[in-house]
Amino acid sequence: MRTSQFLLSTLKETPSDAVVISHQLMLRAGMIRKLASGLYTWMPMGLRALRKAEAIVREEMNKAGALEVLMPAIQPAELWQESGRWEQYGPELLRLKDRHDREFCVGPTHEEVITDLARNELNSYKQLPINFYQIQTKFRDEIRPRFGLMRGREFLMKDAYSFHLNQESLQETYDRMHQAYCNIFTRLGLNFRPVQADTGSIGGTGSHEFHVLAESGEDDIAFSDSSDYAANIEKAEAIPRETERAAPGEELRLIDTPDAKTIIELVEQFGVAVEKTVKTLVVHGVEKGQLVALIVRGDHELNEIKAANLAQVASPLVFASEAEIRAAIGAGPGSLGPLNLPIPCVIDRSVALMSDFSAGANIDDKHYLGLNWERDLPLPQVADLRNVVAGDPSPDGKGSLVIKRGIEVGHIFQLGTKYSEAMNCQVMGENGKPATLIMGCYGIGVSRVVAAAIEQNYDERGILWPDALAPFQIALVPMKYETEAVREATDKLYAELTAAGYEVLLDDRDKKTSPGVKFADMELIGIPHRIVVSDRGLADGMLEYKHRRDAQPQQVAVSDILSFINSRVHR
């Protein structure tokens, strides 16, 4: 492709509304253009990268035995009402009516549509297991679209759905899809981690997220420094570093703390070590009007997912108001603790191993110092309540946890029978009786993958594409293309490279465009391999080659350039 036949629309300045690096660089490199909030046009340069990601996803889905379909983007309300999600789904679901006043929605996901397809097309156990997938545009009406393609309203997604007679069959497909996802992200050249995840509102019995590691990620993930263990913060089990509780060394004291309403104020005013403090959080219980106290160490954070999963705690988690706390305990939120607490209490594992610690006295403006379990108060129920922190022991017993930010680019679920039961999706089983199908679902944000790759691969000059995603493999940049010798050598090399199957962008802009601008544009776009043709180099029989990640160029003989490129370009 020649730039004279291509739309090269780079920008010198970064648009003011672009915050994350992928948004900035995709706009500057002319890959996307904003149409409205959360809506983007894919320009020719960006679309080439998107299609490459899509092709790899499609190849690996086909290898995994999935069957490609294409379902409507617009879905009838009746299907969502049948599953129960029409009422449950929030304003992210864009709803509309046609000219006949029939209700529809723009699909953010396709569980209902695929379940309807399965119940109409599948009738025998002999057709199972079966796995359908599509690569299609989705729409979610995000309240605050931001970060370009990272959290837009319209996006390209690969979603797959499998149907099974039993859990064993589902597990086999789930494992196959897990491996397919690992293959996809490895082929895309991404530094990623598959992590154990909470099933959330989708439900089911098993879930993994796939995260690209990047500082701009919205999620915290924990992984072992000595094994393959990885989980998101919501799911990771918190193992205390201590193995047993130290013996008491202080007397119990009640002190006045009128100006210490927070852990920070208690630490600053009384010289208490933060790891010797606890914080008491009060939430609604499952019984109406009941409150439950949850206690974690002062330097730890409550994990709301773990808390909501406790049998005596209401789900979703609801924190008690100050009025409710005062009515039940007789003190405000800044003065709560486990001693003489009149409501049920659950403490974190790390709290159970504390000695000589400080806590609120359940009296306004008073705290206890030197508290000890089984001396001053009995040990209450103990549970895993907190988020893990860096340095915690890995739950698999191998090494310590590292915490990094991640961008979620894929998610797989074992759905079970949530949709098939609600929508009566059955086939005739081997015993001649109707059997409700068990489902799995598997998603990849294809357009988000492109942005995530940039978040992980860039420098001060622009994008550093992994080879698999680069819109072009080679940038061919002639100096003084208008001169006969340079033009002939450039055109000959361009023909040879394209005949060899390489994707080449020949920068044939005229002399009004300086060499510096040409180099800057190619580095901004991130084309991995650059070949410069100049009259001075040709006089010596040489061409200049530079990989986008190299600091300095090198000279390669004209006669050797094809073999050299063959050795450097991964195809």
Curated annotation (Swiss-Prot):
Disulphide bond pairs: none
Listed SUPFAM superfamilies: Class II aaRS ABD-related, Class II aaRS and biotin synthetases, YbaK/ProRS associated domain
GO molecular function: aminoacyl-tRNA deacylase activity; ATP binding; proline-tRNA ligase activity
GO biological process, one term: prolyl-tRNA aminoacylation
Source domain of life: Bacteria
EC number of the protein: 6.1.1.15
Catalytic activity: tRNA(Pro) + L-proline + ATP = L-prolyl-tRNA(Pro) + AMP + diphosphate
Gene Ontology cellular-component terms listed: cytosol
Protein task: Catalyzes the attachment of proline to tRNA(Pro) in a two-step reaction: proline is first activated by ATP to form Pro-AMP and then transferred to the acceptor end of tRNA(Pro). As ProRS can inadvertently accommodate and process non-cognate amino acids such as alanine and cysteine, to avoid such errors it has two additional distinct editing activities against alanine. One activity is designated as 'pretransfer' editing and involves the tRNA(Pro)-independent hydrolysis of activated Ala-AMP.
Domain remark text: Consists of three domains: the N-terminal catalytic domain, the editing domain and the C-terminal anticodon-binding domain.
NCBIfam families, A to Z: PRK09194.1, proS_fam_II
Protein name, as recorded: Proline--tRNA ligase
Species in which this protein is naturally found: Stutzerimonas stutzeri (strain A1501)
